[in-house]
Swiss-Prot record:
The gene is matK. It comes from Clematis terniflora. Belongs to the intron maturase 2 family. MatK subfamily. Keywords: Chloroplast, mRNA processing, Plastid, RNA-binding, tRNA processing. Usually encoded in the trnK tRNA gene intron. Probably assists in splicing its own and other chloroplast group II introns. This is Maturase K. One of its GO terms (cellular component) is chloroplast. One of its GO terms (biological process) is RNA splicing. It comes from the Eukaryota. The keyword Membrane does not apply. GO terms for molecular function: RNA binding.
Amino acid sequence: MEELQGYLKIDRSRERDFLYPLLFQEYIYALAHDHGLNKSILYEPMENLGYDKKYSLIIVKRLITRMYQQKHLIIFTNDSNPNFFFGHNKNLDYQMISEGVAVIVELPFSLRLVSSPESKEIDKSMTTLRSIHSIFPFLEDKLLHLNHVLDILIPYPIHLELLVQTLRSWIQDAPFLHLLRFFLYKYHNWNSLITQKTKMILFFSKENQRFFLFLYNFHVYESESIFVFLRKQSYHLRSTSSRAFLDRTHFYRKIEHFLVDFRNDFHTILWLFKDPFIQYFRFQGKSILSSKGTPLLMKKWKYYLVNLWECHFYFWSQPDRIHINQLSNHFIDFLGYLSSVRPTPSAVRSQMLEKSFIIDIVIKKFDTIVPIIPLIGSLAKAKFCNFSGHPISKPAWADSSDSDIIDRFGRICRNLSHYYSGSSKKKSLYRIKYILRLSCARTLARKHKSTVRSFLKRLGSEFLEEFLMEEEQVLSFILPRISYFSKRLYKERIWYFDIIRINDLTNLS
């Protein structure tokens, strides 16, 4: 953010944000490349031209010069069905502009959040909050005292024009808003895509992820704004969002702050739902609202959320996108884990003088398990096994060297072990490892035109053990008495604070 401020030199005292002139500044496209979420399309032309993967100002200048030439930017205004052509390499030019627009449109939000008094305090606690695993200890501490959950799918806007109208409250630059409309209508088929019940994020264009991720995150930001009153009612709410919005998948910032102004009549209505034990958490398009309240209160929440989203935000939220469940007999599908709160009965012996008593008590336990069926489906989509879980070879990797094949399978196995180290039961994880191990063996046997049995008999099975036991070897350096710990590894849960993105195989499920 310091780099953005240094480049742009924006006067924060101005009440209005005029962003359109920034489109003609070359450094904006440099920032779009340097601060991109994913590998930029600029990497490919630089490789073809013999450059390395660093930013090249010469390439940016050439692209901007070509975009300024009329013969490469033709707009047919008299045609009843206008089409836009961006020269011979329209995809590259179009992505350059869209990435620049994405950087510019984030500025009003980022600068306001940086200028907030809470930002410095939040930066101090960013180290552990970056990890996805950091949310599970929080859930274990809070959900044990709650009764019901609302499984909510984030609603979608009726029309993408509503996103532009909502942005008008943040950006008062009319030419820039017209440019946003241009990009939205370029993807006119979005209105049919976002009405699907599948994950909205899957429809993002691979070439313009930053632009559409911003729109999606702004949409989620608005839909979550109804929970701002809870921070004023109870300190128990720990809802988080990111500095430049949360769902960048590689999310790198989280803050505990909402910057949304509410109408006075909202407070009167929302006060009826005062609940000091309510908890809210979200990832991508799915959110969970848990409470200690009665089923009647949860039904009120469901009715109120649907009506508020539809009537005040014009978001299309069907009632079947919100489900009421009881925590004691429900699994929460969140971040690739199946989490649950299970009552565990136990007996306690109490002795007073010469008499003893046995007291039966019930203790709630927070469990997290690996969803085996969705993971097998993901492995099947990636061609590691069939949908029944039977391992198959990976023909696409058969041309690689033996060490490269083993390294690829080992990396997948280690990443899965690392991500699902917080599972209460490791049996499902061991089955996934078994599938990957046999798939690796079948791939090597296919390469050497041999059977799996004869191949393992000739080379021995030890060469496949190293990447399957990586997690246990790491733990031996961290925890003492590893021989004792290895016996309990099946039941122990370990959360890591260096995981900043969900596992790729989990995203496929």
